[in-house]
């Protein structure tokens, strides 16, 4: 089938019907909580509910949903045609010329106040994900409650709780994203040599993986961002890996370097996550000891995930194993994992203080790490989906040491 003849159902993205069902869930939630209108400012939350993906800037965008089922939006003029191309039909809208005013003499949130007035929401119960637009790219603005001169119930959980359990369509997109994250990692691993430049190998593999993705998927692939590539891989090396989020360093790969990698795909706006610990040349006894400990801890994390347990209970299993069986609790720097989907990190978290109940359809990273100061970090991360009885890995790259040795 030629790209020109592809129907929207063939494209790798969430369809209009699912976006409509998401908004209907919000309408019911508003009615149950006796909330008259909800203002959604977070760009990812706007996209989740409307299908409108955009590049967030200093110009506020807000989606407004009302308990009686109306959909409206605050938009800068420069995004109007973009919203019309992607988003649902609106019952009302407020367009402003520019930020901070574009000659209108009015802050954009005053246009939102006018919109809420037309919707009959002023003076009634209004909620929002956050109390006003986030401060990015030089934006300055008042809280929504100050503009409206009334309380606003601000709660990110109103939308983010709905995002925790993924639909079949979301899981399919993330499964495809995992496939391309795995592919990017393979290209990168196969390109690493002693003397390789860390940055050049990382970016070269990402570009080649993206070329492969576009060649295979063609018009089925629908980009959802202005920045970044659909398939990505990177690594850091040596003692820098002892920092869980160490930055890139200039220089070349050397014999004996420990490598901690990261790779992911993005399909339909949904991400994957894959990380591996590798070694350049033959691993010595010290490396093998920590690698085996990390691998065992990750397996405990896999085994801990099943419906009905809490995130804290799963994390407790991992931390208990690292403390009591490995005697390495002092090498832990972070929790075992996190949810994700449209964002690289999403609620909930596999953390001792997150008591969210695990449900089928949730997607997590599982990535307990051990960090040995001035030596190296040891961390695998895999994308998993919760099933009715446990979990299933979506990232399929080998976890075993024999497959993660780079020839010296």
List each model region and its residues:
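Active-site neighborhoods and metal-handling regions in enzymes and metal-associated proteins
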Residues: 1-408
């Amino acid at each position: 089938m030629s790209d020109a003849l592809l129907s929207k159902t063939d494209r790798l993205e969430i369809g209009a019907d699912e976006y409509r069902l998401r908004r209907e869930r919000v309408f019911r939630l508003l009615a149950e909580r006796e909330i008259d209108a909800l203002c959604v400012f977070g760009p990812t939350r706007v996209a989740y509910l409307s299908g409108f993906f955009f590049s967030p800037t200093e110009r506020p965008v807000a989606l407004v949903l009302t308990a009686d089922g109306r959909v409206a939006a605050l938009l800068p003029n420069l995004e109007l045609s973009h919203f019309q191309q992607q988003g649902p039909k609106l019952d009302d809208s407020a367009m402003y010329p520019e930020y901070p005013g574009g000659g209108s003499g009015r802050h954009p949130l005053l246009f939102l106040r006018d919109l809420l007035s037309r919707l009959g929401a002023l003076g009634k119960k209004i909620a929002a994900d956050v109390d006003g637009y986030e401060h990015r790219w030089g934006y300055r603005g008042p809280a929504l409650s100050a503009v409206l001169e009334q309380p606003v119930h601000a709660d990110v959980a109103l939308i983010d709780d709905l995002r925790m359990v993924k639909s079949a369509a979301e899981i399919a997109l993330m499964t495809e994203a995992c496939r391309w994250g795995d592919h990017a990692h393979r290209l990168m691993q196969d390109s690493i040599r002693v003397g390789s430049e860390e940055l050049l190998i990382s970016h070269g593999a990402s570009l080649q993986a993206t070329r492969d993705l576009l060649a295979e998927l063609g018009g089925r692939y629908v980009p959802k961002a202005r920045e970044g590539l659909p398939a990505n891989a990177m690594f850091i090396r040596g003692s820098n890996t002892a920092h869980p989020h160490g930055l890139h360093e200039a220089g070349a790969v050397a014999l004996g370097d420990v490598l901690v990698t990261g790779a992911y795909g993005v399909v339909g706006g949904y991400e994957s996550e894959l990380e591996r610990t590798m070694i350049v040349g033959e691993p010595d006894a010290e490396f093998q000891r920590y690698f085996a400990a990390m691998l065992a801890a990750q397996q405990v994390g896999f085994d801990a995930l099943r419906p009905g347990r809490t995130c804290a209970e799963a994390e407790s299993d991992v931390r208990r194993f690292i403390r009591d069986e490995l005697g390495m609790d002092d090498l832990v720097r972070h929790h075992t994992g996190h949810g994700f989907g449209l964002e690289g990190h999403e609620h909930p978290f596999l953390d001792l203080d997150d008591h969210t109940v695990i449900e089928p359809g949730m997607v997590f990273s599982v990535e307990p790490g051990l960090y040995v100061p001035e030596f190296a970090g040891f961390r695998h991360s895999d994308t998993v989906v919760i099933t009715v009885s446990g979990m299933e890995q979506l990232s399929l790259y080998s976890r075993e040491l024999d497959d993660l040795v780079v020839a010296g």
